[in-house]
Amino acid sequence: VVIFERKLSIGGGMWGGGMMFNKIVIQKESKRILDELGVKVKEYKEGYYLANSIEAVTGLTFQAVKRGLKIFNLISVEDVMLRKERVAGIVINWSSVLHVDPLSIGSKVVVDATGHSCELARLIEKKVGSYLKTESGGVMGEKPMWAEVGEKTIVDNTKEIYAGLYVAGMAANAVFGGPRMGPIFGGMLLSGEKVARMISERLEKGDLD
């Protein structure tokens, strides 16, 4: 499993918590994920917990790398590879030097976890047309902030949107027209867990060979 991170640091917007107060909120449903990875949480009120955003990012990263994840930072994805109407990889380049010819990376599955911009989904829409598995066939666009709804829909919206391409995290809500949530990250954790499980199950069955 490989993550290509455009920026120098990984973790998206989690570092800053809510408006740079370095605290994030998670619900009881996702608390077990942070517990498993050794990230401390403190109960705020029934059903809601607080975690230090710095500890959460670094803890998640450390444990993921320790378990085999490869991370390449300062690399942008500028295109996708398509073979027989299926995403078969991505096209990458250095984030700081985009005027040189890129490299292609083949993959059995690609996950668009580019956040609010859902960049890979938009690339498919631009290059192939409105063939995404959404109501419109295209990117529906992120709706205004509504944390309660967004936290539920982000897990439901985590799925395959084009053959070989899944969406997770805020990219999922952006593609399917779900609302944004602010500094509450329980749904994000559950979304990541769900997409990993879905892909693992298909790999075990040999569906992606």
Task: Indicate residue ranges for each PLM-predicted region.
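Residues forming the flavin
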Residues: V1-E29, L37-K45, Y49-D209
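Core catalytic machinery and nucleic-acid-binding channels of phosphodiester-processing enzymes
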Residues: I33
